């Protein structure tokens, strides 16, 4: 996690990494909520 964050601190990597992380987190929450619900 620390190494990934350091690499993501670059100028051309923070946007894609951030979008992927946010999308993955949202998808996981949706998946868990949909499956549990």
From Swiss-Prot:
Disordered as annotated region, ranges: 1-37
Keywords, comma-separated and alphabetical: Capsid protein, DNA-binding, Virion
* Gene Ontology MF terms in the entry: DNA binding
Primary place of residence?
A: virion
User: Pfam families attached here?
Assistant: Microvir_J (PF04726)
Q: Which InterPro entries does the protein's record reference?
A: Microvir_J-like (IPR006815)
Query: Which terms in the GO cellular component ontology are assigned?
Result: viral capsid
Subcellular compartments:
Virion
Domain of life, per the record? Viruses
* Keyword check for DNA-binding: yes
The subunit structure is: The virion is composed of 60 copies each of the F, G, and J proteins, and 12 copies of the H protein.
Q: What does this protein do?
A: The J protein is associated with the DNA and is situated in an interior cleft of the F protein.
What is the protein named?
Small core protein
- Organism per entry: Enterobacteria phage S13
What lineage, starting at the top, does this entry show?
Viruses, Monodnaviria, Sangervirae, Phixviricota, Malgrandaviricetes
């Amino acid at each position: 996690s620390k190494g990934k964050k350091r690499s993501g601190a670059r100028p051309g990597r923070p946007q894609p990494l951030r979008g992927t992380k946010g999308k993955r987190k949202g998808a996981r929450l949706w998946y868990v909520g949909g499956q549990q619900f």
